[in-house]
């Protein structure tokens, strides 16, 4: 007999070898139809897997995140089976779950098309309707290699050769299909009814462009048709909001092959960039930050001292000059320590909040580049806070409050925080880790932010907070970070003179709010669908003339608005007014002033807003006052 413990403090004895579905039927009959797997001693188990030792037991239902991931894993296997049955010469490689879905990579000379996806989906439905059981088997290494070699699955043989010799090799079967897999899986294929294959793309074996080229089929799977429909509708909405499409339409930026992964900012896009930069600069000044500027090109010796050379060498752009190896900086932190080290610091000088709009470059594979979201050249709203251990809590709280304030101004109020605490292998004493972790917890709690814990996921040099924004269509974007660092200041010789007259290494807080300007602007474009808040809009006001008689008056209005720092576009073209209105709606300008003979005579304007088809007349002084109110944050 074995003892099995449950979350409700119940402990019950069962025969050794009992299976999860028997326990569910016995103790949780109401959850029978919703249960998809179990967690035994913290490890996910198939419901058909035998339990052979004392353990804890937790039911995993389809309504949980873990349950949903299992559904997606099941669907990936079903897709692989369908592809293999339809295209027998295909070799299957890997098929993991990802956010919102799954993919599988295939080695084949056949070029998959959207028409193929429809046919594959039909075959998948056939497999699902057969209600095939997922069967787990444990094989020896020799058995696994022999089997997959015999059916021509060379990539599976390669994977097996990299599995540590002390690990079990598990396979799963459903119907005629067998795949190498750790599991777990649902009892059968019937839970994978709500799915859609979404796209085909190229990939490489093991993600290395020097290896064989593969084809990747992506899909999504959900608990039911309602969730699937909502997700697919959001995909359509996301396509409409694509920052690359809107960026072209609004003439904000472009990218070209001659500067791969770098941005050509057009006037309107650069206007947004400068507005954000000036806004952040003012916020930093008001919160006690000093602004610095550090070199872009540095000798590799500094990167060797900091430890970045070993970890980031492959992502650095290098140059040779005067028999020295120089690296374009991929981050700013070592440079900020050089400024800290430029003179003797006292404990009375701390905290020092050192900010830089730091331009950095990192080599990203060309296939990973994506508009503004993934680039090679970028600018961070970077800052490093040098403080004492006793100042960690107050500095972390000040940062959280500043971050919330800034996100709110940009239209983000739904913020998720991930807290990563100490890993097993770490630098620094337990005492300083205790202080740092307590400080981060307190800062998010006092700031009234909810957080989830990522146990053991902190860096070896300190715990961290990651701040994720939820946009208008529910997508999550990780932007802000607050990372403690107990190591780099010591490694680069940073110290201050304490009240005891001795040298002490400061604690360094790496922090960012936007992340990078490029990516954050991309997020803003998609969040607002190009309809920026008025304070952020590159053109805030369009003045449209109805006839030639109103051109001089319109010019005077433009001058008056510009005197109040309003960004104005004047349209005096010889087009009908309805055409002009449609044109400026397409440009997503938030406010229109329409002027004709009547407005000239009355010293007024007809006001129309982007989100309304109504117009109303207002005296110019009142209209300007209203405009200035709308244009303020």
From Swiss-Prot:
The UniProt note on the cofactor reads as follows: Binds 1 zinc ion per subunit.
> Which biological process, per GO, is one annotated for this protein?
threonyl-tRNA aminoacylation
Task: Give the enzyme class.
Answer: ligase
Supply the Pfam families for this chain. HGTP_anticodon, TGS, tRNA-synt_2b, tRNA_SAD
Its recorded reaction(s) are: tRNA(Thr) + L-threonine + ATP = L-threonyl-tRNA(Thr) + AMP + diphosphate + H(+)
Q: Which UniProt keywords apply?
A: Aminoacyl-tRNA synthetase, ATP-binding, Cytoplasm, Ligase, Metal-binding, Nucleotide-binding, Protein biosynthesis, RNA-binding, tRNA-binding, Zinc
**Region Catalytic, residue ranges:** 242-533
Q: Which family does it belong to?
A: Belongs to the class-II aminoacyl-tRNA synthetase family.
Question: How is this protein named in the record?
Answer: Threonine--tRNA ligase
Q: Which organism is it from?
A: Ehrlichia chaffeensis (strain ATCC CRL-10679 / Arkansas)
């Amino acid at each position: 007999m074995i003892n099995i413990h449950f979350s409700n403090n119940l402990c019950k004895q069962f025969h050794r070898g009992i299976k999860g579905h028997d326990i569910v039927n016995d103790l949780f009959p109401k959850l029978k139809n919703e249960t998809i797997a179990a967690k035994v001693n913290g490890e996910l188990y198939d419901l058909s897997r035998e339990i052979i030792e004392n353990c804890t037991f937790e039911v995993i239902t389809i309504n949980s995140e873990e349950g949903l991931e299992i559904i997606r894993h099941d669907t990936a296997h079903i897709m692989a089976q369908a592809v293999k049955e339809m295209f027998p010469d295909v070799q299957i490689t890997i098929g993991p779950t990802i956010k919102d879905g799954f993919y599988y990579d295939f080695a084949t000379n056949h070029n998959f098309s959207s028409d193929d996806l429809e046919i594959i989906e039909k075959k998948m439905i056939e497999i699902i309707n057969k209600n095939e059981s997922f069967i787990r088997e444990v094989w020896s290494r020799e058995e696994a290699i022999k089997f997959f070699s015999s059916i021509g699955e060379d990539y599976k043989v390669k994977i097996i050769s990299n599995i540590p010799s002390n690990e079990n090799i598990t396979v799963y079967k459903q119907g005629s299909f067998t795949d190498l897999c750790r599991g777990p899986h649902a009892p059968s294929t019937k839970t994978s009814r709500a799915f859609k294959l979404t796209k085909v793309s190229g990939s490489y074996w093991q993600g290395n462009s020097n290896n064989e080229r593969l084809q990747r089929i992506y899909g999504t799977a959900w608990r039911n048709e309602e969730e699937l429909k909502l997700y697919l509708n959001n995909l359509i909405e996301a396509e409409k909001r694509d920052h690359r499409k809107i960026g072209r339409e609004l003439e904000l930026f472009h990218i070209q092959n001659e500067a791969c992964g770098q941005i050509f900012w057009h006037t309107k896009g650069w206007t947004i960039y400068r507005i954000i930069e000036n806004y952040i600069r003012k916020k930093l000044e008001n919160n006690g930050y000093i602004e610095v500027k550090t070199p872009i090109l540095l000798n590799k010796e500094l990167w060797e001292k900091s430890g970045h050379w070993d970890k980031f060498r492959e992502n650095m752009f290098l140059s040779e000059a005067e028999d020295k190896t120089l690296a374009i900086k991929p981050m700013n932190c070592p440079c900020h320590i050089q400024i800290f080290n430029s003179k003797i610091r006292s404990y009375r000088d701390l905290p020092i909040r050192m900010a830089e709009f730091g331009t950095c470059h990192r080599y990203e594979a060309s296939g990973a580049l994506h508009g503004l979201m993934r680039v090679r050249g970028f600018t961070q709203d970077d800052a490093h806070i040098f403080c004492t251990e006793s100042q960690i809590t107050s500095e972390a709280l000040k940062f959280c409050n500043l971050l919330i304030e800034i996100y709110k101004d940009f239209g983000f109020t739904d913020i998720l925080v991930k807290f990563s605490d100490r890993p097993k292998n770490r630098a620094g004493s337990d005492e300083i880790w205790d202080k740092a972790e307590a400080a981060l917890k307190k800062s998010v709690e006092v700031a009234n932010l909810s957080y989830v814990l990522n146990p053991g996921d902190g860096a070896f040099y300190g715990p961290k907070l990651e701040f994720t924004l939820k946009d208008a269509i529910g997508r999550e974007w990780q932007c802000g970070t607050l990372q403690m660092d107990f190591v780099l200041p010591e490694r680069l010789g940073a110290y201050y003179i304490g009240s005891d007259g001795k040298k002490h290494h400061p604690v360094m807080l790496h922090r960012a709010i936007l992340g990078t300007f490029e990516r954050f602007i991309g997020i803003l474009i998609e969040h607002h669908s190009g309809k920026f808040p008025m304070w952020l809009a590159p053109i805030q006001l369009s003045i449209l003339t109805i006839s030639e008689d109103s051109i001089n008056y319109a010019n005077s209005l433009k001058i008056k608005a510009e005197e109040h720092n309003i960004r104005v576009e004047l349209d005096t073209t010889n087009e009908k007014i309805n055409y002009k209105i449609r044109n400026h709606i397409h440009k997503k300008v938030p406010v229109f002033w329409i002027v004709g003979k009547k407005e000239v005579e009355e010293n007024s304007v007809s006001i129309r807003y982007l989100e309304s088809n109504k117009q109303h007349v207002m005296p110019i002084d009142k209209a300007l006052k209203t405009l200035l109110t709308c244009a303020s944050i």
